[in-house]
């Protein structure tokens, strides 16, 4: 675990065979859809807003799900590979996870982006957010924490 700033850490090579799942998803023709963002805070409505977030998404099942198939296998292996990292993070920062949201598999094409945003929100309180890169051979895609003046290129 490498700390980049208070509470912002990097783990590398946590899920070495992750690209096998991407290959299977592509071979099976599993559909990607446009990712959504909160578009009306007062009524808690989500929708597509490509000016804020322009990316493709596959929603994965929860790691406790009884579903079967490629996406369920990916979720379970993802969770099993990352759980030791989360445990180490929680022990280091005295953090606690009360529930896991379903993971999202995101795909960014050329010119796609997710602008500056905060993951914590009154409707969906997030104390720990996790980003995992399934590959490293891409252009752009730096992660930036503007409040810390921190920008880095993630590795899988």
Q: What residues fall within each predicted segment?
A:
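Non-heme Fe(II)/2-oxoglutarate
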Residues: 1-90
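Catalytic core of non-heme Fe(II) oxygenases with the double-stranded beta-helix
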Residues: 68-156
């Amino acid at each position: 675990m490498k700390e980049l700033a208070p509470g912002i850490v990097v783990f590398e090579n946590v899920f070495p065979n992750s690209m096998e799942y991407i290959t299977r998803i592509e071979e099976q023709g599993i559909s990607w859809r446009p990712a959504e963002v909160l578009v009306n805070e007062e009524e808690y409505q989500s929708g597509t807003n490509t000016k804020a977030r322009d990316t493709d998404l596959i929603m994965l099942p929860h790691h406790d799900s009884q579903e079967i198939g490629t996406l369920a296998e990916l979720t379970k292996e993802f969770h099993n590979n990352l759980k030791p990292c989360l445990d180490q993070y929680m022990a280091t920062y005295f953090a606690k996870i009360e529930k896991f949201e379903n993971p999202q598999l995101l795909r960014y094409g050329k010119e796609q982006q997710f602008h500056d945003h905060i993951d914590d929100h009154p409707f969906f309180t997030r104390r720990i957010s996790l980003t995992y890169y399934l590959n490293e051979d891409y252009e752009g895609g730096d992660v930036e924490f503007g409040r810390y003046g921190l920008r880095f290129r993630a590795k899988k």
